[in-house]
Curated annotation (Swiss-Prot):
Main location group: cytoplasm
GO molecular function terms noted in the UniProt entry: flavin adenine dinucleotide binding
Subunit structure: Homodimer. Heterotetramer of two MnmE and two MnmG subunits.
Name of this chain's protein: tRNA uridine 5-carboxymethylaminomethyl modification enzyme MnmG
Residues the record lists as binding NAD(+): 275-289
Gene Ontology BP, a term: tRNA wobble uridine modification
Organism: Buchnera aphidicola subsp. Schizaphis graminum (strain Sg)
GO CC aspect terms: cytosol
Subcellular compartments: Cytoplasm
Cofactor(s) the record lists: FAD
Length: 631
């Protein structure tokens, strides 16, 4: 696409955060002329809060974004300054990669990836209004009264819609420190048929690294070998790896906080929005867990060249003088200096129950919402929604069928189903525990689950498609090879198994079945004399091992998925008036009319909808079928 001035686009994306960048890139990748509008081009892809990508459940989303051709995994591979696998001693379903990020490098790498998208134009301007005609979005209006027109719009405004920052009892309008909130657009959106509420998030003070005493603090190094996020990535992509440090709050810290709760906007009623349950402020921790003697604080570098340390664990909106007292009471931070105060930010979000599973608004055709505007918290949750919204905005612009993953296909499927079915009364964060199919939704198989779909949708380029097919072939060939290699009871390899792993063979066994034993890994097969490693790709080797070890469990889970798919594939029309279906309880009628589920499966996951309600719906659908087809 020519980068010259244009007014007409296929897709317009509002907001250059994690949701917006993925949305813009996805739309451009599938061939749509795309415009990304952002208040500050320099802040595209910025890590507003913690300088890290991944974590429990979140890393699965990053892997899925990558399998769908997205940006986040590739950007963090080139920006991560410490990589670790969390839950490494647990089963593969809950193992989660986490990377400490260099803030500057991460932004730079996101911008580099966006520059490669030939169908994408980026413009620095603020949007003040949507142009809507007959409940169809047709464009946007900027603060300078410039109009841009499109067939689809993605709204990914983060914390900027009506954003308000709180430090102590003082507050001011802002979407992020040093950046103005989007007030005109927030007011305009409240005039549209959306259900709007407020949420809150927060961030800790930043500390000058040169004023910290690291002696006697616990040092936390990254993993060796260093993990990689992208299926196209390599360890050689990583910059210099550096450690983090661990310290703790103490009784003195807690007493300072208790004495100053009357200065907290959280406890004086100034902040109305609900904060994230799984990332509470230090004030919340002290109030909610009064018996705890200490709380962890991870001292995380913000980059290789940055002098700022992010003290993960003490998010706060107390006044600056109190923040200084809190920090100075902590071991290693006695003489430290705060560079930037912590703060809380309140912002508008829209009820995600008003969205289809494609993230298109039920009320405004062509309008897609992604990220914190949908009630989520976290970069990874935002980015995955952005990719899906951008893809479907592009498909809508092309008059093509839209796509979304099911719960059994991806954590992204779990995320959007939870949001559109349950809504968000508090900021939604992804965990592996949210999925009932987590054994088949592992980090390591995200590409096997999604890349073929992505290729058919136009999201994946040829190099990735070739790499994917090579991996699939290598896994298949190696499994067949392992099946043919046998170990006999009186062989030298049988003796080795007995000596190293206390395994006594009474009959012959092939290597594939040997891998089912918990003590045997693909890596330690190298101790066998008659075995040679047949695959150099460690990721593919791990895939083989996981599939073999958990074969029985995976088989049962797949059978369960097939049983549930019958209900998932039984549609419910959005035009149904549930008042007219006999036998439904008053509560069921209210909830079904409110949520408008798209399938019987989705209806079954609405809080308060009982198995009896589902039976009544199925009977009604059966009667309706016979009425329409046999009359």
């Amino acid at each position: 696409m020519s980068k010259s001035y244009l007014k007409n686009f296929d897709v317009i994306v509002i907001g250059g955060g994690h949701a917006g960048t993925e949305a813009a890139a996805a739309s451009a990748r599938v061939g749509c002329k795309t415009l990304l509008l952002t208040q500050k081009i320099t802040d595209i892809g910025v890590l507003s809060c913690n300088p890290a990508i991944g974590g429990i459940g979140k890393s699965h989303l990053v892997k899925e974004i990558d399998a769908l051709g997205g940006l986040m995994a590739r950007a963090i591979d080139y920006s991560g300054i410490q990589f670790r696998v969390l839950n490494s001693k647990k089963g593969p379903a809950v193992r989660s990669t986490r990377a400490q990020a260099d803030r500057i490098l991460y932004c730079q790498n996101i911008k580099k990836l966006l520059k490669k998208e030939l169908n994408l134009l980026i413009l620095e301007t603020e949007v003040k209004d949507l142009i809507v005609k007959n409940y169809q979005v047709i464009g946007v209006l900027t603060q300078s009264n410039m109009s841009f027109y499109s067939r689809s719009v993605v709204l990914s405004t983060g914390t900027f819609l009506g954003g308000k920052i709180h430090i102590g009892l003082e507050s001011y309008s802002a979407g992020r420190k040093g950046e103005k909130a989007s007030i005109d657009l927030a007011l305009r959106l409240r005039d549209l048929p959306f259900r709007v509420d407020r949420l809150k998030t927060g961030t800790p003070p930043r500390i000058d690294i040169n004023t910290i005493n690291f002696e006697n603090l616990f040092v936390q190094h990254g993993d060796v070998p260093t993990p990689v996020f992208s299926f196209m990535g390599d360890i050689s992509n990583h910059p210099l790896q550096i450690p983090c440090f661990l310290t703790h709050t103490n009784e003195k810290t807690h007493e300072i906080i208790r004495k100053n709760l009357h200065k907290s906007p959280l406890y004086t009623g100034i902040i109305k929005g609900v904060g994230p349950r799984y990332c509470p402020s230090i004030e919340d921790k002290i109030v909610r867990f009064p018996d705890r003697k200490s709380h962890q604080i991870f001292l995380e570098p913000e980059g290789l060249t940055s002098i700022e340390i992010y003290p993960n664990g003490i998010s706060t909106s107390l006044p600056l003088d109190v923040q200084k007292e809190i920090v100075s009471s902590v071991k290693g931070l006695e003489k430290s200096k705060i560079i930037t105060p912590g703060y809380a930010v309140e912002y508008d979000f829209f009820d995600p129950k008003d969205l289809n599973l494609t993230l298109e608004s039920k009320w405004i055709k062509g309008l897609f919402l992604a990220g914190q505007i949908n009630g989520t918290t976290g970069y990874e949750e935002a980015a995955s929604q952005g990719l899906l919204a951008g893809l479907n905005a592009a498909l809508s612009a092309k008059d093509c069928k839209q796509w979304f993953p099911r719960r059994d296909q991806a954590y992204l499927g779990v995320l959007i189903d939870d949001l559109t079915t349950q809504g968000a009364n508090e900021p939604y964060r992804m965990f592996t525990s949210r999925s009932e199919y987590r054994l088949t939704l592992r980090e390591d198989n995200a590409d096997l689950r999604l890349t073929e779909i992505a290729y058919k949708l136009g999201l994946v380029d040829n190099p990735r498609w070739i790499r994917y097919n090579e991996k699939v072939l290598n896994i298949s060939n190696e499994k067949n090879r392992l099946k043919k290699i046998k170990i006999y009871p009186k062989s030298s390899d049988s003796t080795i198994l007995n000596q190293l792993f206390n395994i006594v063979l009474t009959k012959e066994i092939n290597i594939l079945n040997l891998l089912k034993r918990p003590e045997i890994t693909y890596e330690n097969l190298k101790y066998l004399k008659n075995f040679k490693v047949g695959i150099s790709d460690l990721e593919a080797a791990g895939q083989i091992e996981n599939e073999i070890k958990y074969e029985g469990y995976i088989k049962r889970q797949l059978e369960e998925i097939n049983r549930h798919l019958k209900n998932e594939n039984t549609p419910l029309l959005p035009t149904y008036d549930y008042n007219k279906i006999k036998g439904l309880s008053h509560e069921a009628v209210l909830k079904l009319n409110d949520y408008k589920p798209v399938s019987v499966g989705q209806a079954s996951r609405i809080s308060g909808i009982t198995p009896a309600t589902i039976s009544i719906l199925l009977i009604h659908l059966k009667k309706e079928y016979y009425k329409n087809h046999l009359s």
